[in-house]
């Protein structure tokens, strides 16, 4: 009886761990998001060649977030990070209308990978503070998210520099990864 109670208690209150892969085109704001979540402040970034990885503690959950560079020459390396990924954060520069089709193509190419079949998808429609930014509905349309029938997905408007929307995204991830496990 005591052992059963101990197992139940630890399941309810133990820190959960989640492996998150954050990708998107270059200059979408991935590294800014990562360090805003980790440190609570804006850091000066340079283009990521390779990856940054940080553990973000939030609401009794330990998110291990892999931020992988988005330049076209290094996107083929994304697949090396797919294994054991529970949640995929795809960051889009909502102000970059010229490259939203490129973003869509990269997103769908990734989602067709077998290793990501069970990962939930969170899209951060970033840079919402800019006056010409596309809203979440327009990004949903341009990325073809409604065509994702076999995928659990959500889009969250964000502003990496203020932190707006970031924790709402983590809330969605934590409840939706937890229900899938």
UniProtKB/Swiss-Prot annotation:
One Pfam family of this chain: Arf
Similarity field: Belongs to the small GTPase superfamily. Arf family.
Residue positions of covalent lipid attachment, annotated as N-myristoyl glycine: 2
Originating organism: Zea mays (Maize)
Positions contributing to GTP binding: 24-31, 67-71, 126-129
Keywords on record: ER-Golgi transport, Golgi apparatus, GTP-binding, Lipoprotein, Myristate, Nucleotide-binding, Protein transport, Transport
Main location per the UniProt record: Golgi
Protein name: ADP-ribosylation factor
Reported function: GTP-binding protein involved in protein trafficking; may modulate vesicle budding and uncoating within the Golgi apparatus.
A GO cellular-component term linked to this record: cytoplasm
GO biological process, alphabetically ordered: intracellular protein transport; vesicle-mediated transport
Localization terms from the record: Golgi apparatus
PANTHER family attached to this UniProt entry: ADP RIBOSYLATION FACTOR-RELATED
Gene Ontology molecular function: any one: GTPase activity
């Amino acid at each position: 009886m005591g052992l059963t109670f101990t197992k139940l208690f630890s399941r309810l209150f133990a820190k959960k761990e989640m492996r998150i892969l954050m990708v998107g085109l270059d200059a979408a704001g991935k590294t800014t998001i990562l360090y805003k979540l980790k440190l609570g402040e804006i850091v000066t970034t340079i283009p990521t060649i390779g990856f940054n990885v940080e553990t973000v503690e939030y609401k009794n959950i330990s998110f291990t977030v892999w931020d992988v560079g988005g330049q076209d020459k290094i996107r083929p390396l994304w697949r090396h990070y797919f294994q054991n990924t529970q949640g995929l954060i795809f960051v889009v520069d909502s102000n970059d209308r010229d490259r939203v089709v490129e973003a869509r193509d990269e997103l769908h190419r990734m989602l067709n990978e077998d290793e990501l079949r069970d990962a939930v998808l969170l899209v951060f429609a970033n840079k919402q503070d800019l006056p010409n930014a596309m809203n979440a509905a327009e990004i949903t349309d341009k990325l073809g998210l409604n065509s994702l029938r076999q995928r659990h997905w959500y889009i969250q408007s964000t502003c990496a520099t203020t932190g707006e929307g970031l924790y709402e995204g983590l809330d969605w991830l934590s409840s939706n990864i937890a229900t899938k496990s």
